[in-house]
Amino acid sequence: MSWSSAAEDEILIGYGSQLVKIYNLNTGSFTFAEERKIGEGCIVGIAKSKGLLMTGVESGVVKCWEDEGRESAGGGMVIDTGGPLERMRYSSQHDVLATGGKENDLKLWDVATGKQTFTAKNVRHDSLELRVPIWVTDITFLQGSKKVAVTTKYGHVRLYDPSTCTRRPVVSVQIPEQALTCISCSSKDHHVIVGSGTGQMNLVDLRSKGLVMNKYKGFVGGIKAIGCSADEPYIASVSLDRHFRIHHLFTKELLFKVISTLKFITLKLLLLSFTAVKHRHCVCSCNR
């Protein structure tokens, strides 16, 4: 799921069957519902840019579609990311797609041309001279810069700077014994929030050499998605224990918790934006 634009008036929803729906918040109704078949597997990322709908699937294929389904010269563009995908993210600020998955390291793509603009290079071998495996699980673009941060199944949080000549991460920090599942930029500069499959959520400082900081408590199941306000110190999260939570970024206090009565397999947080605790805008969906 994702917003269709910065106006946050439409929600893009991609299903496991590759069905795509667009929900308009102003009218309170679905304005689009059609299958967008490409490759194999579930949709792992969906975005919209300049009239084009973009979907990425587990088999590693990304395609741009016209909203109405008719392919134009540019609208039929297909991108082969070179391996299986866990996540596809879009930056409207730079008109760039970011992709990553198992043994398919971070890549950036120009949406206008479909050309690859950046390919991450794996970190050096570990202390035993063994290759460090690659498994990107989530991606986020840092606010106000071209830097991109990723999480991995092996507990790594890595920061890449495509504006430099280096392809390796400029910052890499590991949270021991944690399979990280999601990441979101916080309102604090160069700080991200990460969640793991065991229900651990941390604040990570990506300045200098990187530092794992605050640990937020109250989780029982694995964390599926995190959303942070761009302006206020609040963190929203959903987890496999069917709870939706809001924590304070600095005090670590659990401010709000509610359980869903819906039966579902996974609950995914789309995004949240709020100007104060009393004014919250959160959207969730359930995959049955």
Q: Where are these predicted regions, by residue range?
A:
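WD40/WD-repeat beta-propeller blade N-cap
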Residues: 35-44, 78-86, 120-136, 173-180, ...
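Loop/turn segments within WD40 beta-propeller blades
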Residues: 2-8, 46-51, 88-95, 100, ...
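Conserved strand-to-loop turn within each blade of WD40 beta-propeller repeats
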Residues: 14-17, 56-59, 100-103, 111, ...
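Asp-box/WD-like beta-propeller blade repeats and closely related beta-sheet repeat scaffolds
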Residues: 32-94
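WD40-repeat beta-propellers
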Residues: 20-25, 62-66, 106-110, 157-162, ...
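Solenoidal tandem-repeat scaffolds enriched in leucines and small polar residues
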Residues: 79-163
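Terminal intrinsically disordered, low-complexity extensions flanking WD-repeat/beta-propeller proteins
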Residues: 1-13, 17-19, 39-43, 222, ...
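Beta-propeller domains
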Residues: 12-36, 66-70
